[in-house]
Amino acid sequence: GGIVIVPKENDIMEFTPVQYPADRSEGDTITTHFDFHAMDDRLVKLDILGHDDPTVLRMLKDITGLDPQTIPLDDPETMKIFRTSEPLGVTLDELDCDVGSIAIPEFGTTFVRQMLKDTRPTTMEELLRISGLSHGTDVWLGNAQELVLSGTATLSQVICTRDDIMNYLILRGGDPSMSFKTMESVRKGRGLTPEMEEHMRSIDTPQWFIDSCKKIKYMFPRAHAAAYVMMAFRVAYYKVHMPLAFYSVYYTVRADAFDIAQAEGGAQKVLANINAIKKKGNDADKKEEDLLTILEVVFEMNKRGIELLPVDLYKSKASQFIIEDGKIRPPFSSVAGV
């Protein structure tokens, strides 16, 4: 989350009123009343992000004995799930999904799954570019997506990460310093100055490229996208080749959102619960949205032939999903209210 830093000699109330999440004044967490953009000229904010993925990989290593660092990043079956669900041996038409990236970090959301449908990536480079597109603001929707679908440009040509702008302009013979300044201006959402646009035209930069730069509000760095893709590919390898370990670890890390009453009963019952939440649309609360993500994974798992066992007083763990006879045994924490 975002952490606002207040100088020792100041009080937060000099800058903004504060409030307690859910009006729980006895809690330790307070939030600023104003959006940070109202204060960003006065206070420093740190974005301290939590990542489950390193924990997931460590748990997968402990269960399978396979070191994620040794996973080949060119495994063909793993690469396939980013464009089809065929390596999983199932179809997911009921979820309006024809790729196998559900539950894969950075590639499992509805938004990115649609990107995968539109682009059908076949290489690590294309996955990296999709990661850059999905983490930017106004980079894909209303911008690169239209260019790709219209045939104006391909995925390999559109602007995906901030580095693409500088490298592209330099390769066309542009001035390195001006190319760098152009990249910095665009990635911060400041658009192009007349000088930058004139420089781009002097090296015959296509009009669609210039127009694309003007729409962008924020751009992801290429190295960051590469780190995300490598992590995602390693997790995906376990999903394809070691599904029992993958699903048990996925649920364990997200046990707080798991509800065994909604997840048991087989694929058709789970699908009915998925559709019930979807029907609520914007009326679905955060807990239901988190549960929907879990249920999609359970549905896919059931279609792959892996069942959820009932919670057992003598066999279930407190909070860890365990593998048992080719099936998965939920913990006590998966029971609502426990």
Model feature map: region roles:
Residues 1-338:
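Noncatalytic, beta-rich nucleic-acid-contacting surfaces in large DNA/RNA-processing enzymes
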